[in-house]
Design a protein with these regions (language model features):
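Serine-hydrolase catalytic machinery in alpha/beta-hydrolase-like enzymes
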Residues: 2-71, 81-85, 127
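Conserved hydrolase catalytic core segment
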Residues: 85-96, 105
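Active-site nucleophile loop of the alpha/beta-hydrolase fold
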Residues: 34, 98-107
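Catalytic histidine-centered segment of alpha/beta-hydrolase-like enzymes
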Residues: 169-179
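Active-site loop->helix "elbow" adjoining a glycine-rich segment at hydrolase catalytic centers
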Residues: 76-80
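Short beta-strand/loop motif that positions the catalytic acidic residue
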Residues: 132, 137-140, 152
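Conserved alpha/beta-hydrolase fold motif
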Residues: 73-74, 97
């Protein structure tokens, strides 16, 4: 069966949630987990790496195992952010990507500023239309406090794919909506 490269969000696992759904559909999963209580969690070597090291590991994974037009890559939340930076630094990607509830940069949420590493670099690439032309579908919820709708629309406009913002959905999009998107995306 074909493989999917999947990077879940912080705390997400390859063997639960979306990972289980993809496995149930017969796909082999390869990916990286950003799980653990903190960025220096020793129980997960990938999570203990710096941001740039994580990006470089994902670049290596993509170039080694998924550098074909048939490649399928999924990023959820911060996992999408890592994949976006990986592809930005690589300059292109021949496969197909799906970002679910993607983190695309700094955002003020419920009284605090969430500013992921190198958020200005990704923002500049999106605003300057220098993000690589890839096949990218984005699915996000309209009430997701991590969603940057302008950046999501700009990114979608400069890539081959689609942007779907689901009314009334937050950062955790209902599983039935995700399944319907997977049905179309994997077809």
């Amino acid at each position: 069966m074909p493989a999917i490269y999947y990077v879940p969000g912080r705390g997400g696992r390859l063997n639960s949630g979306l990972g289980l759904e993809l496995s149930a559909r017969g796909y082999d999963l390869i990916g990286r987990e950003i799980a653990g209580p903190g960025p220096r969690d020793q129980s997960n070597p990938f999570a203990s790496l710096s941001f740039q090291q994580q990006v470089e590991v994902i670049q290596h994974d993509l170039q080694t195992h998924f550098w074909t037009p048939e490649a399928l890559v999924i990023g959820n939340s911060f996992g999408a952010y890592l994949i976006a930076h990986s592809i930005l630094q690589l300059g292109n990607f021949p496969g197909k990507c799906l970002f679910l509830s993607p983190v695309l940069g700094a955002v003020k949420t419920t009284g605090m500023l969430f500013k992921p590493p190198k958020s200005g670099v990704l923002k500049d690439a999106i605003e300057n239309r220098s993000f690589p032309l890839i096949i990218l579908d984005i699915l996000a919820g309209s009430t997701d406090e991590h969603l940057l709708p302008v950046e999501a629309e700009q990114l979608s406009d400069q890539t081959n794919g689609s942007l779907s913002i689901i009314e009334g959905q937050g950062h955790q999009i209902e599983p039935l909506i995700i399944k319907a998107k997977l049905d179309a995306w994997l077809d």
